[in-house]
UniProtKB/Swiss-Prot annotation:
It is found in: Secreted; Target cell membrane. Belongs to the MCD family. Mastoparan subfamily. It comes from Vespula lewisii. One of its GO terms (cellular component) is extracellular region. This is Mastoparan-L.
Length: 14
């Protein structure tokens, strides 16, 4: 998992 994917997941969760 890369930073872009992590950022996208965080945006979905938050």
């Amino acid at each position: 998992i890369n930073l872009k994917a992590l950022a996208a997941l965080a945006k979905k969760i938050l």
